[in-house]
């Protein structure tokens, strides 16, 4: 049984995206990637799973004088690399990196029950004991594009209300869905304008999200909800506002290829944090995913150095914009059973899959000089 811990009001959260037996489509999230080759593994001094990843001082050093909080994404609900890592160890790793938010993906039934309670419940208990906040990313599992808007709203409200009724005592912030705009984009569009989206699919999605938001807040009146997008797909978030979805936080995903392309014509966006501030002046901004995308043409050492540089530089931008409240890196561990990119996103890499790992140099990226 899950103990009742009053730990939902700790402020901002660290997000590790844990997928309930599903995975994010990170390689499809934006700009096309040509890197499909596997990176070579580097063997070095390993650390056992029981050891913390990095010192708390590293992030605190980076964020000195700032109110920005940080987090990490993880996939502990069925992903192979997490099968031998206990909930206690995951929370220890989060705390060891100076983070206090862990973002997890949660699949729930229409009754609001998480599909893997034997993994979810211990994580809640360990997070409470370790003073780490969990950000649940709740999938729109019952949404159907064939539904009417009224039917979609009702389904969303039922799922949201039931989830908050069962678990609301653990959370203040709820992340509604992931990569939702990708299924709505029309071909050869950027996602900046409302004309770039399939209106029929958008209406069904927006109705579901409105219901989900209303349902959560009907059972958890103090709840704050967030909805995300990536690349230049902020048009989706603006359309949700116009539709009447009362989400509270702009959640955004940003990767190194986006950072390189955005400043160039015709985009002319040198700082995505400032662009989002101009579009959403009254909402806090959270980056619920950010990281460097490895290049197959680079050596492993070159990629790790570039990853460290991107993470450090992007966090400086976040720190310098007070509207950005939380920055969540993607992801905790390399996942070599998946794609080339998923094999390399981690701040920790495997020495002996899946029993021993060690820090990448990007694990020290959160240090400002």
Q: Which residues are covered by each model-predicted region?
A:
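Active-site clefts of carbohydrate-active enzymes
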Residues: 142, 279-311, 331-346
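Aromatic-rich peripheral "rim/lid" segments of glycoside hydrolase catalytic domains that contact
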Residues: 82, 180, 190-192, 197, ...
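C-terminal motif of bacterial Sec signal peptides marking the signal peptidase cleavage site
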Residues: 21-23
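Aromatic-lined carbohydrate-recognition surfaces of secreted/lumenal glycan-active proteins
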Residues: 206-236, 282-293, 326-334
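Active-site groove signature of glycoside hydrolases
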Residues: 162-199, 226-228, 325-333
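Aromatic-lined substrate-binding rim segments of carbohydrate-active enzymes
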Residues: 90-144, 148-160, 197-226, 266
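Aromatic- and acid-rich polysaccharide-binding/catalytic face
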Residues: 136, 178, 231-267, 284, ...
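Boundary/entry segment of secreted carbohydrate-active catalytic domains
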Residues: 40-100, 105
